[in-house]
Amino acid sequence: MYCILVAGMPASGKSTIAVRISESLGIPMLSKDSIKEVLFDDLGFHSRAEKVQLGTAAMHILYYAAAQLMKAGKPFILENNFEDASIPGIMALLETHHYTAVTVRLTGDPEVIYRRFAARDLSDTRHRGHVVNDCYPEPPGAPQENPTRKSYEQFLDDNAARGYTRFQANGPVLEVDVTDLSELDFPRLMGSLTGFCTEGSSWISSATAHTKCIIPDRK
């Protein structure tokens, strides 16, 4: 059985792509950030350390839910900032339940993605729990905390150190250029995914399981 991991650097469009894949394939999608938002709203936090604990709890919940789907033999999608540190946990889950993961790894022009990253926390649609670090919910009447923005160099260094753009699991990688999401050739992406994910396909046990496929922008 298969699952799909949607990975990539922050603000690359993982949630948007994961939702579209989920709707196209008719399979469930689990998002760590969505779980974190529920924990932010239900439990809140009063320090950076407490916020980090909620992030850790969200990861445990994500993997628990994935394990239940695996026990039922269901295909599904996980969306997360997968990084080098994620590999032991996800690989253990895949091996325990005999699943193979297709990694959809989002990439593109880092300057463009950085601009999306810098603008995201200023958006009214961004959950404030992701933005603030000291306290959430924010006390009534308190001045709104502004995000401490990483420089472009810090953004690049963090991506390189954490391995967002090199993550892969135990199956093939579809590397997708998301520099301009409006120009993404989504039907081509879905054609590639459908071919990989057809039950019984030979890629699961083939020697080409780690071949990188480039899905470029539609021109």
Q: Could you tell me what each predicted segment is?
A:
Residues 3:
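Walker A (P-loop) ATP-phosphate-binding motif of ABC ATPase nucleotide-binding domains
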Residues 13:
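Conserved glycine(s) of the Walker
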Residues 73-76, 100-102:
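Loop/turn-to-beta-strand initiation segments
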Residues 123-184, 204-216:
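Small-molecule kinase domains that catalyze NTP-dependent phosphoryl transfer to phosphate-bearing small molecules
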Residues 10:
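The conserved Walker
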Residues 6:
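Hydrophobic anchor at the beta1->P-loop junction of P-loop NTPases
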